[in-house]
């Protein structure tokens, strides 16, 4: 048995201890936290226009959950180009292109009359030139720079949450904060994947297999709690609304308290 062993294998197949909803977890979790962040600032994600970068696991399921919550996602991208679809990204078609055919977004554009395909060009700012309310970078590190941030702010963005690991440069992050944009760092907003891996381990330890809905509900609760932990930390230390500082403080305190309790420091 893997339970109780010194090593842990996660993201396994369902037939050997994996968990339902693990595939969707990072993208879904991103939206659950974003939804809560907006709600706590007097806004609702329903009816909002969202731009997403990427077309991999995180992006696809972020788009799917955003649309389930009533938002319209109008962009996605891959390494060769990006899509602007003013009618809203067709998630079923995107999944067919990316998960079944393993093809490029040119195939999405060819099958979707409302979609506009833009080939990637050096120096071009891609999806971040599109007017939106909420921006979700879900592609790669340092993909959203200062010029992108300026374009987004000029176009009226009011919230940015990271789906990828560190996709926003430090300069862009600071620009968002100075201009009153709600900004949540990936260390909090993309935690849904690793959180669901922990839920997978919980199921293994009890020899249980929860339904998709059970895992999804627990994931949402975790992401909502993460947001409130960082929000509370930011307020407590005099930095209300600074979710980067809140995430850093909350994370540090959790580790420090555990180390102190175990006599490590």
Roles of regions detected by a PLM:
Residues 2-8:
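Short, small-residue-biased leader/transition segments that mark boundaries at the very start
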Residues 5, 18, 22, 26, ...:
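Helical "substrate-binding/catalytic lid" subdomain
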Residues 9-17, 179-180:
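Glycine/charged-rich beta-loop-alpha catalytic/anionic-binding loops adjacent to active sites
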Residues 13, 18-24, 28-131:
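Glycine-rich phosphate/diphosphate-binding loop of Rossmann-like nucleotide-binding domains
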Residues 24, 28, 44-48, 52, ...:
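Conserved structured core elements
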Residues 29-36, 40, 61, 65, ...:
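Alpha-helical scaffold segments in soluble metabolic enzymes
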Residues 81-183, 188:
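Rossmann-like adenosine-cofactor binding region
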Residues 153-265:
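Adenosine-phosphate binding glycine-rich loop
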């Amino acid at each position: 048995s893997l339970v109780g062993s010194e090593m842990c294998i996660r993201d396994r197949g369902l037939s050997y201890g994996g968990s339902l909803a693990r595939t969707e977890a990072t993208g879904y979790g991103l939206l659950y936290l974003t939804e809560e962040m907006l709600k706590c600032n007097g806004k609702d994600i329903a009816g909002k226009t969202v731009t997403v970068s990427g077309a991999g696991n995180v992006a696809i399921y972020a788009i799917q959950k955003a649309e389930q919550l009533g938002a319209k996602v109008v962009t996605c991208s891959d390494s060769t180009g990006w899509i602007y679809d003013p009618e809203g990204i067709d998630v079923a078609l995107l999944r067919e292109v990316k998960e079944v055919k393993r093809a490029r977004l040119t195939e999405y554009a060819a099958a979707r009359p409302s979609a506009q395909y833009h080939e990637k060009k050096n120096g071009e700012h891609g999806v971040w030139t599109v007017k939106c309310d909420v921006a979700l970078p879900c592609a790669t590190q340092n993909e959203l720079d200062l010029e992108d941030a300026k374009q987004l702010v000029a176009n009226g963005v009011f919230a940015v949450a990271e789906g990828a690991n560190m996709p926003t440069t430090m300069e862009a992050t600071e620009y968002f904060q100075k201009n009153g944009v709600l900004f949540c760092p990936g260390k909090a907003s993309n935690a849904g994947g690793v959180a669901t891996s922990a839920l997978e381990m919980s199921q293994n330890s009890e020899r249980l297999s929860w339904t998709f809905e059970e895992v999804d509900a627990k994931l949402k609760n975790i992401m909502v709690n993460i947001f409130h932990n960082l929000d509370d930390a930011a307020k407590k230390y005099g930095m209300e609304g600074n979710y980067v500082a809140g995430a850093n403080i909350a994370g540090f305190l959790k580790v420090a308290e555990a180390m102190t309790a175990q006599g490590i420091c």
